[in-house]
């Protein structure tokens, strides 16, 4: 149908060239249907999980912030959620989970007992794999892997 040449405006050099053989006239594009959990997981390179941290002598906000920092540096999309008393924790978790986020939930024992709908992507046994920041982050990273590929250091390509 025709040829094209792309020229860089700054350097005035040829950036690309090609041949158009046919025109796609279909009405739908790359994503057919709605953007759902699977699409978000594929784009982010991670599966949404909620990791429950119950406050104790060892587990405090600083500890969870350190875990979040390690995960964030590794390219995970994280959110540290420390709800105040009276918040609808289950509703907030539902929305964060739909968004494809790794949620680090810092709660006291009473709040932990009040949470409904703990799904298969709700992790409470993280301490069985160690209690050091790096060990916990490695366990969460493993649990939030999308498919077979593990994204590290923001390397999505």
What are these regions (language model features)?
Residues 1-57, 66-69, 73:
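C-terminal effector modules of nucleic-acid-centric enzymes and ribosome-associated factors
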Residues 15, 32-45, 138-157:
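C-terminal accessory "lid"/substrate-recognition subdomains
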Residues 54-58, 82-84, 106-110, 127-130:
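Structural motif
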Residues 63:
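Hydrophobic positions on the alpha1 helix immediately C-terminal to the Walker A/P-loop
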Residues 76-119:
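Conserved nucleotide-sensing/catalytic segment adjacent to the nucleotide-binding pocket
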């Amino acid at each position: 149908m025709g040829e094209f040449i792309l020229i860089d405006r700054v350097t005035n050099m040829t950036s690309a060239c090609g041949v158009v053989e046919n025109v796609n006239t279909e009405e739908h594009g790359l994503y057919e249907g709605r953007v759902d959990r699977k699409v978000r997981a594929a784009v982010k390179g991670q599966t949404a999980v909620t990791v429950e941290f119950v406050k104790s002598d060892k587990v405090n906000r600083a500890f969870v912030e350190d875990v979040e920092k390690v995960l964030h540096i590794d390219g995970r999309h994280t959110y540290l959620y420390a709800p105040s008393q009276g918040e609808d924790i289950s509703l907030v978790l539902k929305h964060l989970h739909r968004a494809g986020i790794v949620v680090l939930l810092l709660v006291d024992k009473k709040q932990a007992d009040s949470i409904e709908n703990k799904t298969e992507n709700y992790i409470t046994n993280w301490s069985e794999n160690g209690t050091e920041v790096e060990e916990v982050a490695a366990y969460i990273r493993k649990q939030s892997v999308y498919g077979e590929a593990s994204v590290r250091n923001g390397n999505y390509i």
